[in-house]
């Protein structure tokens, strides 16, 4: 039993009619100009063929005659052919001009699409290009928390410790400063600081 499954698209239909009418339709090389009204001839010849419908034939014929192969074949001096390859008259000048204009327009559209595609690819590549990372600046060391110096624990100086040469601390209000007793005059005591400066202070301001 023959396979009667319908053809799926215009490409398959063109291949099928090229097989049925090899002297008229070709799949390779320059195509021959077709007889005017050849669609009706096709529809009549394939009327009982379950593989293809008139709608499919019309779409396939439109695709075939708008291909670059076919438009290249429509040139001065070329002859139209019928389904069996028989000549059906020479092409008219207006038909040649129309075919050449259609070919130029089709090529221009393809070129425009190609340029648009190239532009799109470049833009996508540019967008996907990883951005150069800025050199990381050396992190500044965070200020270490200031360690509060605990004041040196001192005690009140005993009267027996008020002797020349003894090391003492002078209470200066903001803190104690090391000093050496150089002279004792009752409650007044002369001391010498570590920087060599001498001063008289009250005994009550001295601590051990």
Swiss-Prot record:
The keyword Disulfide bond does not apply. Pfam families: ProQ, ProQ_C. Residues 107-127 have a biased composition (Basic and acidic residues). Coiled coil: none annotated. Residues 107-152 are annotated as: Disordered. InterPro entries: ProQ, ProQ/FinO, ProQ/FinO_sf, ProQ_C. One of its GO terms (biological process) is post-transcriptional regulation of gene expression. GO terms for cellular component: cytosol. It is found in: Cytoplasm. Residues 128-137 have a biased composition (Basic residues). One of its GO terms (molecular function) is RNA strand annealing activity. Keywords: Chaperone, Cytoplasm, RNA-binding. Its main location: cytoplasm. Belongs to the ProQ family. HAMAP family: ProQ (MF_00749). NCBIfam families: PRK04950.1. RNA chaperone with significant RNA binding, RNA strand exchange and RNA duplexing activities. This is RNA chaperone ProQ.
């Amino acid at each position: 039993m023959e396979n009667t499954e319908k053809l799926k698209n215009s490409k398959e239909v063109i291949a099928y009619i090229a097989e049925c009418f090899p002297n008229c339709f070709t799949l390779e090389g320059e195509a021959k100009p077709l007889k005017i009204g050849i669609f009706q001839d096709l529809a009549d010849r394939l009327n009982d063929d379950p593989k293809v419908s008139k709608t499919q034939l019309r779409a396939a014929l439109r695709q075939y005659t708008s291909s670059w192969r076919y438009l290249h074949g429509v040139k001065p001096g070329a002859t139209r052919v019928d389904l069996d390859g028989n000549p059906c008259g020479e092409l008219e000048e207006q038909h040649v001009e129309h075919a050449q204009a259609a070919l130029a327009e089709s090529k221009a559209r393809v070129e425009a699409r190609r340029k648009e595609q190239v532009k799109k690819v470049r833009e996508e590549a540019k967008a996907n290009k990883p951005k150069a990372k800025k050199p990381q600046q050396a992190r500044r060391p965070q200020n270490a928390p200031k360690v509060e110096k605990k004041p040196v624990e001192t005690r009140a100086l005993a009267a027996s410790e008020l002797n020349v040469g003894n090391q003492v601390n002078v209470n200066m209000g903001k803190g104690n400063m090391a000093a050496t007793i150089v002279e004792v005059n009752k409650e007044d005591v002369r001391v010498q600081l570590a920087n060599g400066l001498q001063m008289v202070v009250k005994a009550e301001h001295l601590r051990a």
